[in-house]
Amino acid sequence: MTEETTAIVQAGPTSIWLSENGFEHQALEADHSGVELIKVEADFLIPLATALYAYGFNYLQCQGAYDLGPGKELVSFYHLVKVTDNVDSPVEVRLKVFLPRDNPRVASVYWIWKAADWQERESYDMFGIIYEGHPHLKRILMPEDWVGWPLRKDYVSPEFYELQDAY
């Protein structure tokens, strides 16, 4: 018989603020540098992201994605920063949205942070995550006729791909 242990995660200040204001989320353990991590369901991303923008997280430093492994979920993440005048150590938080690999869809945050434009396109191009409402969602790195999502861990690389002449 094995014992399961559940680690109690200390909610950070942003998570506490979200809870006080009625936003559904789950606090995750902070990363190695102390950045607060928050798990958000795809349906609640836009209301929560809009609230965080109003709360002062005015800079999307990075948006990206990763694959948890074959048959497992894909993750779309958003690293937000509160940029204010004369601050040496701005407040940072990272949102994570876990998506099913068979239909990875989440609303685009482009309309909140314009910096998401090319970053969401790259996540689409490499992992196949559909960012609903994105104005230009198309491949950005791979050729338009490329089949599959190259950074997924279950991706099988084609044996041959013929480059087309530019002329």
From Swiss-Prot:
SUPFAM superfamilies: Nqo5-like. Its main location: membrane. NDH-1 can be composed of about 15 different subunits; different subcomplexes with different compositions have been identified which probably have different functions. Its EC number is 7.1.1.-. GO terms for molecular function: NADH dehydrogenase (ubiquinone) activity; quinone binding. It catalyses: a plastoquinone + NADH + (n+1) H(+)(in) = a plastoquinol + NAD(+) + n H(+)(out); a plastoquinone + NADPH + (n+1) H(+)(in) = a plastoquinol + NADP(+) + n H(+)(out). It comes from the Bacteria. One of its GO terms (cellular component) is plasma membrane-derived thylakoid membrane. The keyword Amino-acid biosynthesis does not apply. This is NAD(P)H-quinone oxidoreductase subunit J.
